[in-house]
């Protein structure tokens, strides 16, 4: 919307903007904000910044060194369609208040450094990313945990388990079965108008949508695909995408979750990520003579993704819930191989006709619980390491990997089965991320400590309700 400070300030004056919503991303990937009146938003903010308490933000500073500085990024500004008073929202970079250097734990800074590193390699000058984020639309969610009990419950007018319940006006049916929600027309698809409204608002905020549809899961699983863009821009778009989806749903009395696996015995929500490298305006992943139309550069890029996948998943699939999705039987990509067209492989080469510009790699493992700034940056660094070191991936497999006999399947490498395992893999394999100081040692150590303490240990130490079913009378 804007390219420089003057554009923002002129728009504020000309359009009678009343508030500036200051946004930045915490380490796990949740957008934070505070709001200031435009009367106190002076031009000096673009040079002197705004201060905030970094010790109160997850994964940031200790209390004895808590002051942090925010500097605006004018290119991220948009008019927030959900605010009662005209508000211009803008995402900021985080800096050290003394040295003014960019903060090493700022996720946006890491994404920016990854793009700078790419240009410095001379391999390519631009990386494009295109995520396909899935989510569930529920009518109601309740959950609780305390030392003596726990529960969670979700519900949806569209849920398969509600075919027999009494509903106001009568139960009219048309509820997708478990794993039976892919592409039905209304009335089975209850939420097509809601997704269209989400699409409309996404366009209003500057995000191009290519498609929206019902996904496989019952109870309102959905997908809205946005247009690819450069790494940092796509990560910004995905954060805004989540904001829009959640708020449109809430305005219609619904609630959305991007949890990878909110339902047992139905498909999880993934986020397939398409990526490609370009140089001087030309695509680098196409060769008419290569397998699947891939160039050597693309093949080595895939080699890097597969070689570093156990460590990479610490950023692309960073929650304990991620590994409830990554299991056989629910269309999840658990096999660390690549293939043309084959959706059961974790790396797929989508059909794009004969157009070199359409040639790309689809990494099917990630899920929308990730911090996109860190996930896309880590993917790029893994792919570049593969190119730089000419890492050949294993031979492609064009069979249906879900139907392989046990002896053949045993030879196919699998994704790690838990967050704990991928964190261990990241601890052992992170040199590729630290190239060019894109991911600092401090960032990696902070990520490992945060995830182990606040997620792995937090889950490990608490009794699970199903354990009572299994063991109460043992």
From Swiss-Prot:
Residues recorded as binding L-glutamate, renumbered to this chain, are 267-268, 325, 331, 343, 364
Please give the start and end residues of each transmembrane region. Answer: none
Binding positions (ATP): 210, 274-276, 343, 348, 357
**Catalytic reaction equation(s):** L-glutamate + NH4(+) + ATP = L-glutamine + ADP + phosphate + H(+)
Control of this protein's activity is summarized as: The activity of this enzyme could be controlled by adenylation under conditions of abundant glutamine.
Which residues get modified to O-AMP-tyrosine?
402
Q: Which GO terms describe its molecular function?
A: ATP binding; glutamine synthetase activity; metal ion binding
Where the record annotates domain GS beta-grasp, the positions are: 15-99
Enzyme class name: ligase
Is Metal-binding there in the keyword field? Answer: yes
Q: Copy out the cofactor comment.
A: Binds 2 Mg(2+) ions per subunit.
The record's misc note reads: Two forms of glutamine synthetase (GSI and GSII) can be found in this nitrogen fixing bacteria, GSI is a typical prokaryotic glutamine synthetase whereas GSII is similar to the eukaryotic enzyme.
Similarity comment text for this entry:
Belongs to the glutamine synthetase family.
What's the protein name?
Glutamine synthetase
Organism from which the protein derives: Frankia alni
Q: What is the lineage of its organism?
A: Bacteria, Bacillati, Actinomycetota, Actinomycetes, Frankiales
